[in-house]
Each structure stands twice: as structure tokens, then as C-alpha cells.
Amino acid sequence: MVLAAVASGGVWLQGRVFDRQFDEFARELADTSVDMGFLLSAEQTGRGFAYRDLAIKLRGKDFRLCWTGRAEFGLGMTARLALDKEYGSMANLPEYGIEGLDDELVLKTGLFSSKPELAWRVKPFRVAAGSLFCSAGGLELTSGDVEHEGRLVWRGLSCSEGGESLRTGDVTFDVSVSKDGRRAEMKAMFEGGSADVEGMNLKTGAFEMASTIEETRAETQEDDALYSQSWTLKSGELDYDGVRVLDALTFRANMTNVPERLVDAMALGGAVSPVILEMAAEQAIMQGGMTFDLDECTVTRGEGTLSAAGRVARDGERIGAFSVRLDPEFGADVKGWPEAVAELKANGSLRTVEGRLEAHVELSTDGVAVNGVKLDSL
């Protein structure tokens, strides 16, 4: 009897805690979604002693989705939700030729753990509309601590229409955030793919990318926050219309003293005008002390390599310098490349040093100089 009472009290307490946390979650969800250009809402649609019925709605300009399900309490909490196939855009899927789109969203917390575990899985589905046929491998979003880490796996896609086709392999994203929120890391892996569309044939090998961002100075009333960022990219082969463009690419770079406004602009990507992004970066370098280090950019093609490295950091009139090196045989079989290299050698922009071609580029407030010769124009 005592154990039963204790268990009942524990379930009741979990329900009370859940109600309080859910209300806070719903408010934060609504506030955050407005900034992102759509509306997210969460509500309880029913309740019992050991459960709560839930609905989470997502509304955008051209779509409406709703996840419904139940949270149950016992030795912790488990919530299971799925897309409502009769609500909003889901009801129209057959009109678009989408078949087999099913998902399950599972959120768990332990009895003595405050870290929620998340798993959202979308099963493989198909799209058949006219002569277009696509097969998607589904996706998985998982996290052992939704506030600090997560993994997204997209299980590839293949499409065909007429004589054209597109195929991508698995894509994996891993994201982690430090407990103090000042450092974040992201890793991505792509298994490669191919496209044969509009007369163009493209094939890519696997590539992987990693980046970090860390707050190095907190925002104050006098100063904006500053960040450091780093990127690493490694890519396999790339073929275009049956011609090997490159066998491998390696890129490593980092930036320091990056102002928050520039971080935000870069995060928005294509949503920000390139002119605005360029102006923000120029101001940060020329007036804010931002630095950019290109540690390595190496392209391998056949037996030849092309590499570049350098730094942008203003020091008086000097802005930065880069060195470019390539093997004489690099790109020798590419139409127009040997002629371009010969012209650069003739005007002194490329010179031979120990069997390799080199160019040293100096950037200053007075302009650009290559191998000591100032360029009239870029």
C-alpha cells in the first residue's frame, strides 16, 4: 500500500512538473518561431492522471502541419507523436503524388534525469507525379541531450524523369553546443552523388566538413560580442561531363575577432545580399581587427597539385598576403589552361621556384601586387 502511494505520488508529481515545463516550452516555441518566419504552437488537448494528450502545430505561408500524440508518466516520461494525416498539408499529399510518408517523434526523460532524449524518424517514401518518380530513404533526427547535441541523417534520394536523373547518398550532420553556450561545433558528411539533367552530367565523391564557432568576448554595454570561427573541408573526386575536374580538395581556414553582426549575416547565407556581407567583412577587417587565416587550400588533379595559403590582417597600410603554388603539369590537359599559365609566366605573375610555379600576392590599402608588381586592376 505504501509503495503504491509513493508510486502514485511520483506519477502525480511528474505530471505537475511536465505541465509547468510544457507551458514554458510552448511560450519559447511561439516566440522563437516568429523570428524564423513561421508559427509554431504547442498545446495540451486532453489529460489524465498519468498522461497528457498533445498537439504541436507548424504553420507557414504555404503549409500547415500538426503532430499529435500522448505523453505518459511512470519511471520517467515518454511522449510519442506523429504527423496528423488529416490535418492541413498532409491531407493534400496524394494530390502531389507523395506516398508512404510516415513519421514518429519520441521524447523521453528519465525519472532522475533532466536531459530529454529525442528521436524523430521519417520512413522511406515515394513521389510519383506524371513522368517524375522519386524515392527518398527517409531521415533520422536523434539527440541524447536536446539542449547540447544532435544528429541528423538523411538516407539519400534518387529521382528520374524522362532521360534525366539525380541521385544523392546519405548525408549526416552532427551538432554540439558547450554547456555554457559559448562554443558550437558542426560536422557534415556526404556520401556523394550524381546528376544528369539539362544536358549536364555531374558526379561527386564523398566529402566531409567541420566548423566551430566560439564566443571570445561577451557583449557589454560598450562592446559587441566577438567570435572565432574555423572551417575544414575535404572532398573526393568531381567529374563534369565525363571530365575529371579534381581528384581531391582540402580546405582549412579560421577567423578571429569576428563581430556578432557578421556572424549573423554569414549564418543567413543566401538571405543576405553579397554586397552587404562584403561591406560588413571589409569593415571588420579594416576597422575591427578581424583576421582571416587560410591555412591550406589544396587541389589535387592527376599527378599535379595547386595550393594556396595566406593571411588577411590589417597592419597599417598592409592588409594581407597569400602564396599560390602549382606543379607545372597541373591542368595541362584542360583546354585553355596551358595558354593562361604561359601568359601569367610571361608577365611575371607566375615564376618558377625549385621546379614549381609560384605567385606571392600582397594586399595593401594601395592595391594588389603579385610577385612585387602592382596590378592596374583585378
Describe each model-derived feature in a short phrase.
Residues 1-2:
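Hydrophobic, proline/glycine-rich low-complexity stretches
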